[in-house]
Amino acid sequence: MKSLEYLTETGIKCLKCDEGAIIKVRSDVYCKQCYLRFIRGKQRKQMSSDKYKVKYLRDGASHSTEKVLLAFSGGVSSLVLLDVLARLLEEQKNTHRDLQGFELVVANISESDGTNLESLLSSSSIMQTLLELVGNYEVSIKVKVVTPNIDPVFLRRIGVDYEFNTFANNLSIEEQSVSSLAEILRASPNRSSSEDLRDVIFHQELLRLAQSEGCGTIVYGHSMSRLAIEVLALTVKGRGSNVHSTILDRVEDYCGDQISIIYPFRDLFEYELREYAVLSDLMQYESAFAKYAVPKSKVSKNMTVREILSMYLDRWDESGYLSTASTVVKIGEKLTVPTSQNNSSTYCCDICAKKIYQDPKDWLQMITVNEPAPLVSDEERDYLHQYLTSHTDTISKSGEHVNLCYGCITAINGAGGDSGVIWPLQKDVKFDHGEKEKAKVLKEYSLE
């Protein structure tokens, strides 16, 4: 039995008022307006801090209003979060004489390459649709559409050899023309690895954008269902040590600035957000933004880890076991910071900037058999000779050593194979807090 039911019987009263109920969720029945208030109440609970509330100041006093950056993907959850935040701002404005508790900036990171007319038109169309959407609200909302293009100065060819040593080499003259994130990801034969590396860049870009816009908070529309997928996906991709720091509301330090990361819908399931979108007439925009999203594979072997887990979670709903997602998230929230091996000092991954608590090279060498079985027959020796003459090691071991976590080693092996991948190194970005804009690894192309 599914978790959401439409009521066909007449005479059933809403749990909160005397209006006729139309929907049953979590064993409770709601009318349309009460259900919308139920969803909005969940967001307000997660963002109940005073910095998001209207402040009355004495004459002559000054106060800087909190700015909130909404990570907007165009999916159902981000559409609902935009609507909920905009409705909250409208309520604050009407109740408190045009005062607002915070300012809202909606940021969409376009996955087009930004190098040809078609991709530029795609970014322009996203901007137009977003402007049309925010125009429905009686509050001022800033919109930014950004295409992350990587400065070639910071790009390296990163490779991993059979002993799990990691190297970074300068690009050849032919490779220095690469500047688009889309170009780099298209070269990867493994969609899961591409998705993993893309997430790293997107998160860094959101932090950079929040800093440049003066935002002290980034909000994601992730539901409990999505957070459960993240817990499982991080574990599968070898990033289990990051679970505790990924799904919790937290504060991240970015170039000296403290930025809060919040998931206002962490107590709601995906189907509950989708029903809100249906009742609020937001699904038309979901269809409009879907045209510009990266298409999902329908073939199981080509699906990313996240796509497979999403399909798996849908089956939980159909079988009536969706509450398992809540259990997964609660277990993930209880995880703590890992301890370093033998009390050794921690260091950061040069790709994702996450802390490394145990050397992944030692672990991989311990669980991997690198020595072959002894050759017995002439046929086996002939096969070995054919392999050695045909196989060339394309990874240059003359480059500098780089520190990579287990997840990034796995992603690079999946994305680049024997030749490695072209990718920026976090340690190459030296930020001067006085002149931060001169040291951007990601160049911003924004349409306003």
From Swiss-Prot:
Single GO MF descriptor: nucleotidyltransferase activity
Does the keyword field hold Oxidoreductase?
no
Location in the cell: Cytoplasm
Q: What keywords are annotated for this sequence in UniProt?
A: Cytoplasm, tRNA processing
Q: Domain of life here?
A: Eukaryota
Task: Please state the protein's primary subcellular location.
Answer: cytoplasm
One protein family per Pfam: CTU2
> Does the keyword tRNA processing feature in the UniProt annotation?
yes
Output the GO biological process annotations, alphabetical, semicolon-separated.
protein urmylation; tRNA thio-modification; tRNA wobble position uridine thiolation; tRNA wobble uridine modification
Give the record's pathway: tRNA modification; 5-methoxycarbonylmethyl-2-thiouridine-tRNA biosynthesis
Which GO cellular component term is one of those annotated?
cytosol
State the family it belongs to. Belongs to the CTU2/NCS2 family.
User: What is the annotated role of this protein in its UniProt record?
Assistant: Plays a central role in 2-thiolation of mcm(5)S(2)U at tRNA wobble positions of tRNA(Lys), tRNA(Glu) and tRNA(Gln). May act by forming a heterodimer with NCS6 that ligates sulfur from thiocarboxylated URM1 onto the uridine of tRNAs at wobble position. Prior mcm(5) tRNA modification by the elongator complex is required for 2-thiolation. May also be involved in protein urmylation.
What HAMAP family would the database entry show? CTU2 (MF_03054)
- What is this protein identified as? Cytoplasmic tRNA 2-thiolation protein 2
| Native organism | Lodderomyces elongisporus (strain ATCC 11503 / CBS 2605 / JCM 1781 / NBRC 1676 / NRRL YB-4239) (Yeast)
| Lineage of the organism | Eukaryota, Fungi, Dikarya, Ascomycota, Saccharomycotina
